[in-house]
Regions:
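Hydrophobic beta-strand signal
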Residues: 1-3, 56, 148
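Short, glycine/polar-rich helix-capping loops at beta-to-alpha or helix-loop-helix junctions
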Residues: 8-11, 83-90, 156-162
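Mid-domain Rossmann-like dinucleotide-binding core that forms the NAD(H)/NADP(H) cofactor-binding site
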Residues: 30-104
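Glycine-rich phosphate/adenylate-binding loop and adjacent beta-alpha elements
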Residues: 1-21
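Glycine/charged-rich beta-loop-alpha catalytic/anionic-binding loops adjacent to active sites
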Residues: 19-29, 53, 119, 171
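C-terminal hydrophobic helical "lid"/dimerization subdomain
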Residues: 135-138, 186-235
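Glycine-rich cofactor phosphate-binding loops and adjacent beta1-alpha1 units
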Residues: 97-171
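C-terminal substrate-binding/catalytic core of Rossmann-like NAD(P)-dependent dehydrogenases/reductases
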Residues: 110-113, 156-205, 216
């Protein structure tokens, strides 16, 4: 089972029945981080991606990689933008049509402009939680396009170019859900997608740690060593 609760890293937990989603037999013994997988499904729904659209995903961590696969399967042409070469390789494996190294602000804009014949992107998903990639994501969004904020911004206020957002007529979507029922809905959608083979997150689980080495797992999540995408902790 997967559940919403506030007791991470515990061997046992107690949760409301409405916050628990039963896993099918096909997922027995397989890691299934319900909250982030459900989060990806909810972001996809909020993004409103349509077949034939060009979608830029800024930041290819676990969430960005999942969204690359989901957006590709929705019929979009995905341009993945990430700092690490390893992450760009993951994005290609998850279906990205194009990859761009996240190194220089103006070079990235020029690259995406060229890849889209000057039209930029109908949908841009920012999945880093940092100021510069948020600025970059806005630059890559086409007129009347949709800027989807999926990154978790937690290190202080953000400044945005409101004149640019206004001039381009952007729809700006905060894709974070706070209603527990929406969380559970996303987790149910994720369970179905993985069980039916429409989404395979297994290649993204690059590291595993026992609970006794939780400190190492958290350090890896912070430092992102070469080859790291997602760690799971087992009792």
């Amino acid at each position: 089972m997967v559940t919403l609760s506030q007791h991470a890293y515990a061997e046992y937990d107690l949760a409301e029945v409405g916050s628990v989603v039963r896993l099918p037999a096909a997922l027995d013994g397989k890691p299934f981080p319900g909250e982030p997988l459900g989060c990806a499904m909810n972001i996809l729904a909020r993004a409103g991606i349509e077949t034939g659209q060009t979608v830029a995903i800024v930041g290819i961590g676990f969430l960005g990689a999942l969204l690359t696969r989901l957006a590709t399967d929705a019929g979009a042409r995905v341009i993945a933008i990430a700092r690490r070469p390893f992450a760009l390789g993951i994005a290609r494996a998850m279906g990205a049509a194009e990859t761009v190294a996240m190194d220089d602000h103006w070079r990235i804009i020029e690259a995406v402009t060229a890849l889209t014949d000057g039209r930029l992107c109908a949908r841009v998903i920012e999945a880093t939680g940092k100021q510069w990639p948020l600025d970059l994501a806005a630059e890559l969004t086409a007129e009347r396009g949709r800027l989807v904020i999926a990154g978790y911004h937690q290190d202080g206020p953000r400044q945005v170019n409101m004149q640019q957002w206004n001039w381009r007529g952007l729809d700006v979507i905060n894709a974070h859900e706070r209603d527990p029922a929406r969380y559970v809905q996303g987790m149910r959608a994720a369970v179905a997608a993985v069980a039916e083979g429409r989404l395979d997150p297994a290649p993204l689980y690059t590291h595993s740690y026992p609970l006794a080495r939780l400190d190492e797992a958290l350090a890896a999540t912070r430092d992102r060593p070469e080859g790291f995408m997602k760690a799971f902790v087992v009792p």
